[in-house]
Amino acid sequence: MGQKVHPLGFRLGITKSHSSFWYVERRHYASFVKEDIVIRNFMNKELLETLISLIKIERIYEFSEQRNNTIVYIHVARPERVIGRDGQGLSRIRDILIDRMNYLLGKTPRIITCKVVGVTSPNLDARLLADSVRRELEKRTPFIRAMKTVMLQAMKAGAEGIKVQVSGRLNGIEIARTEWFREGRVPLHTLRADIDYFNDIAHTIYGVLGIKVWVYKV
């Protein structure tokens, strides 16, 4: 059997970059990874309705003062919902995040800055397209219609190709199966090809459905 490689990890350093960017002493490494997990889980839950595309974390660790300066870049399709009036929404989220981290990880000198980045082409973003399929499946929309809709949106937005795969008890049938559709080209083995990928889970009354989306962008 052929083994599949994660499309994003396969292209790190070529067309993709790491979503966490920092360096720290070995004894602090585990605590920084925990902080990353807490930040991502909090943002994905708190900002669910803002259509998050990507969360990037950068750190500048000051060894002399043992202080952690963290910058969180939140890429969303609806930035106005995050920022709020006069930036109050963003400040509230940052304060809640600091309280959550102090509660779960203990109080340490940390400075967190949140910056919002708007997504210019949401219909070419694999995560946003997968989120759209998930919402439709949870509304009990037929899976073929949900898949074809996002594929049409992506191709109209200028994608070179898109592949969407859904697996599980499709339309509530007893036996689980996998269905996929592809439009255009999706060259997974070409390293210089800009492939965006995301996998998501839809919770339905029949069980869990797995969703995978590949988008080939020029």
From Swiss-Prot:
Species of the source: Euglena gracilis
NCBIfam families: rpsC_bact
Complex and partners: Part of the 30S ribosomal subunit.
Primary site of residence: plastid
Family: Belongs to the universal ribosomal protein uS3 family.
GO cellular component: chloroplast; cytosolic small ribosomal subunit
UniProt-annotated location(s): Plastid, Chloroplast
Keyword Metal-binding: no
UniProt GO molecular function: rRNA binding; structural constituent of ribosome
Source organism, top-level taxon: Eukaryota
Keywords for the protein's UniProt record, in alphabetical order: Chloroplast, Plastid, Ribonucleoprotein, Ribosomal protein, RNA-binding, rRNA-binding
Domain KH type-2 intervals: 39-120
Any GO BP: translation
Xref: HAMAP family: Ribosomal_uS3_B (MF_01309_B)
Keyword Metal-binding: no
Pfam family, any one: Ribosomal_S3_C
Protein name in UniProt: Small ribosomal subunit protein uS3c
